[in-house]
Amino acid sequence: MDIHEILKYLPHRYPLILVDRVVSLELGKRIHAYKNVSINEPYFSGHFPHHPVMPGVLIVEALAQAAALLTIRSENMEKDAGQVYYFVGIDGVRFKKPVIAGDQLVLKVEITRQLKGIWKYSACAEVDGQLVTEAQLMCTARAI
């Protein structure tokens, strides 16, 4: 799934679209996606000058966006159908290594549970095959 298709499903836009490509998607199970981290990211001007490090909260947001794509596609949710998909909880976040300009984040998200409109996921981000972030995420769809 390229960026044009991603934009059909996610409501996010610049500067907060944090998934560049989906490389594999198993409906109802898992997704693998990429976020290419460029020196042109707006947050690098302040985090940190002369040592650009991607804020951990944005790595988690990238994982949540990948989770949203997985669920929106798995559940055949329509964009602009009077509902929005919210990130509602997070547990066990660990940041193992910094992510810097030039890195490619590999986002891996797996559905672990779905109950009463709440989806739970096991998520991790890797750079060059090394774990940089891991977390348990929770999301839900709500009427707007």
From Swiss-Prot:
Belongs to the thioester dehydratase family. FabZ subfamily. The lineage of its organism: Bacteria, Pseudomonadati, Pseudomonadota, Betaproteobacteria, Nitrosomonadales. GO terms for molecular function: (3R)-hydroxyacyl-[acyl-carrier-protein] dehydratase activity. The active site is at H47. HAMAP family: FabZ. Keywords: Cytoplasm, Lipid A biosynthesis, Lipid biosynthesis, Lipid metabolism, Lyase. It comes from Nitrosomonas eutropha (strain DSM 101675 / C91 / Nm57). InterPro entries: FabA_FabZ (IPR013114), FabZ (IPR010084), HotDog_dom_sf (IPR029069). This is 3-hydroxyacyl-[acyl-carrier-protein] dehydratase FabZ. It catalyses: a (3R)-hydroxyacyl-[ACP] = a (2E)-enoyl-[ACP] + H2O.
